[in-house]
Amino acid sequence: MKTVIVSTDSNTPPLAEFLNQKLFIRTLTYHLVGKVVAITDNFFELEDASWVADSGRFMQAIKEGKLNEVEPVGRAWVNTDAITDMFPWDHDLPKTQK
């Protein structure tokens, strides 16, 4: 089994590398996009966040930023223990309901 070392600096908080990044986050029950502006305990605080009700074709969502159904919610928090996976979001964050 392969081991990946994220940081050897004990002063670096876990997941700190994601601070100020825009992400598409999937949990078991919902999906969000937003910019990580703070990491507190087990939570990402997201700015300009949206709940993604229907991502559509996943490749188009990630590569082109095309989402079928999205609800901008502003600020949101997601428990990092609930995250199943996440992807860089290299697009503008949604501003309108679709």
Task: Please place each PLM-identified region on the residue numbering.
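Conserved RNA-binding domains used in RNP assembly and mRNA/RNA metabolism
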Residues: 2-98
